[in-house]
Swiss-Prot record:
Pathway: Amino-acid biosynthesis; L-arginine biosynthesis; N(2)-acetyl-L-ornithine from L-glutamate: step 2/4. InterPro entries: AceGlu_kinase-like_sf (IPR036393), AcgluKinase_fam (IPR004662), ArgB (IPR037528), Asp/Glu/Uridylate_kinase (IPR001048), Glu/AcGlu_kinase (IPR001057), NAGK-C (IPR041727). Its main location: cytoplasm. It comes from Caldicellulosiruptor bescii (strain ATCC BAA-1888 / DSM 6725 / KCTC 15123 / Z-1320). The record marks K33, K251 as: Transition state stabilizer. GO terms for cellular component: cytoplasm. Its EC number is 2.7.2.8. Belongs to the acetylglutamate kinase family. ArgB subfamily. Disulfide bonds: none annotated. GO terms for molecular function: acetylglutamate kinase activity; ATP binding. This is Acetylglutamate kinase.
Amino acid sequence: MYEEMDSLIEKASILIEALPYIQKLYGKTVVIKYGGNAMINEKLKNWVMEDITLLKYIGVNPIVVHGGGPDINSVLKKLNVESQFVNGLRVTDMQTMEVAQMVLVGKTNKELVSMLNQKGGKAIGICGIDGNLIQARKHYEYVNGEKIDLGYVGEVVSINAKVLEMLAKDEYIPVVAPIGVGEDGTSYNINADTVAAEIAKAIKAEKLMFMTDVEGLKYDKNSKKIISAISADEVLKMIEEGKIDGGMIPKVLGCIDALKHGVNRTHILDGRIPHCILLEIFTDKGIGTMIHL
C-alpha cells in the first residue's frame, strides 16, 4: 500500500513541477518541427502525437511543421528515380516535385492529422498553397561560387500568419506541409526547418523546437556531455570551427534567425526520447539544447 502511495505522490510531484511552466505557456504558441527517426518509429510517433495533443488541452497552441524525406525517397525508389542533393537540399525536377507534393500533402500530412484526431486533438492539415500560407520564390544554391539550379526548390518570401491565427482561434492544431507557392502559382519544395523558423518568426511564437536524431549540441562530437544552453554567438563560432555541420546547420541558423525576430526560446531536441516535447517544456532540467541570444 505504501509503495503504491509513494508512486501516486511521485506522480503528483511531477504534475506540480510542471505547473509554473504551464502557467507561463498558457495561451502561447509553440512551433514544432517534426522530423527524423520520430517520424519513422511508430512508438515514437505515437508519443509525439500524445505530447502535441496534451499541449493543446492545457492551453498551449502547437503548430506542427513536418518533413517527409524518407517517404519521398521510398516513392522515388519505386519509380527508379535517383535522389540527388546539393548542400542538403533535394534537387527537384518536375517529376520529383509531383512526388514530393503528393507524399508531403497527400500522405504524410494526412497520417499525422489522423493520428492527432484519434488522440482527441482537433488537427487540420494544410500546406503553403492553402490561403497563400507560404509565399515563395525559386531558390538557387551556390557551390564554390557557382550558381546551382535545384529545380522546384523554393525559399520563403512571406508567411500569411492570419491563416494560422484563425485556426488557433478556432482551437485547431495546424499541421503544415512545407510546400510553398510562387506569384505565378508554381509550387515549390521548401526545407521544412526553414519553414518552421519562418512561421515562428511570423507569429512571434513563444518557442521553436526542432526534433532531431541527436542528443543535442556538443562542444566535442566525441563527448557524452550535451550543451544544455548556448548563445547564438557561440553557435556561429561552432559552425565556423566545423563543430556543427550538415543538416544541423539550417536548424541552428533557423533558431538564431527566429530569436532575432521575437521568438523567446529555441530548442534542439532528441526526438528519439519518449515524450521529449513534454520533458523539455515542463520539467526543471529539460532535455536537449536551448539556444538563446
